[in-house]
Amino acid sequence: MRDVFEMMDRYGHEQVIFCRHPQTGLKAIIALHNTTAGPALGGCRMIPYASTDEALEDVLRLSKGMTYKCSLADVDFGGGKMVIIGDPKKDKSPELFRVIGRFVGGLNGRFYTGTDMGTNPEDFVHAARESKSFAGLPKSYGGKGDTSIPTALGVFHGMRATARFLWGTDQLKGRVVAIQGVGKVGERLLQLLVEVGAYCKIADIDSVRCEQLKEKYGDKVQLVDVNRIHKESCDIFSPCAKGGVVNDDTIDEFRCLAIVGSANNQLVEDRHGALLQKRSICYAPDYLVNAGGLIQVADELEGFHEERVLAKTEAIYDMVLDIFHRAKNENITTCEAADRIVMERLKKLTDIRRILLEDPRNSARR
């Protein structure tokens, strides 16, 4: 196994926790990246990783991304993530998630989590019986419902801001958008785009789902092969499925003017952002435009107010514009511009939180 501390240094992490429970078969890793802004927040995914090293690399990379996403979304949480090493189709059990509830609860409010790839809200109903460190539960258990709605809305606002930057108007009527992946988020995004008069090309590994959407929206939708959707001529390419779609193999194949989508970690490496810029393709950082779901979950932990969630999600529009203009003015990539904003915000918070609120020894004396 690789040197864990070396990896933590590379990504800038505070804490990594390995969780094991032989009776349920649980093997999991929790990573807390940065808690300057508040408790760590991030989803819990379940994947049959090939090795512990692969799982560790994933949880470190994803939790760092959550720090940036929380900062840009202006929520008082830091970045965290949990990964379970296992097959979600056969390794789940109520007992396994109750054990997760104990491990996460044992962090005493330093980490909050919920659904991600391979997990669903119903899984965490069991975990929530053991601690209050879970968000995104079903409505019947006190949660606030499907996060795909605000996620899609945030991507939509990101597209509007991109259109304004590129074409001087945020109207998407008549624009061609190629959507890669029409799952929960992709389908809701498709609906929003069709409603404002955009034309959409769609692709998904679920061909039946695509056919159903074609039947629903008619000539507003064109079906495309899932292996060539990124090569389609369009105004905006929107990756809403797997990450890593911008890589050495695809970088010269894009025929779009902008990339704005909900998929996480769309760039395989930072240098791919510079390569997109060289090709005059405008890239909206994924960890900003897909932050709508995070905004809802964070607000749920603070009491939840629907109008506040909508307002913060709509603010993605202004932040995307700010990043585009900053990147242009400073001759840097959009990701570099976003990262600078995050670092500036965290520095300000660090300066503010140097002030001691209470001597912990006072509590001990009570």
Swiss-Prot record:
Catalytic residues, chain numbering: K81
Temperature dependence: Thermostable.
EC class of the enzyme, as a word: oxidoreductase
Binding-site residues, NAD(+): 45, 116, 151, 181-187, 204-205, 241-242, 262-264
Keyword tags: NAD, Oxidoreductase
Pfam families for this protein: ELFV_dehydrog, ELFV_dehydrog_N
EC number, UniProt record: 1.4.1.20
Pathway: Amino-acid biosynthesis; L-phenylalanine biosynthesis; L-phenylalanine from phenylpyruvate (PDH route): step 1/1
GO molecular function, one term: phenylalanine dehydrogenase activity
GO biological process, one term: L-phenylalanine biosynthetic process
Catalytic reaction list: L-phenylalanine + NAD(+) + H2O = 3-phenylpyruvate + NH4(+) + NADH + H(+)
Positions bound to L-phenylalanine: K69, N264
Similarity annotation: Belongs to the Glu/Leu/Phe/Val dehydrogenases family.
Role, per record: Catalyzes the reversible NAD(+)-dependent oxidative deamination of L-phenylalanine to phenylpyruvate.
PANTHER family: LEUCINE DEHYDROGENASE, VALINE DEHYDROGENASE
Name used for this protein in its record: Phenylalanine dehydrogenase
Organism: Thermoactinomyces intermedius
Gene: pdh
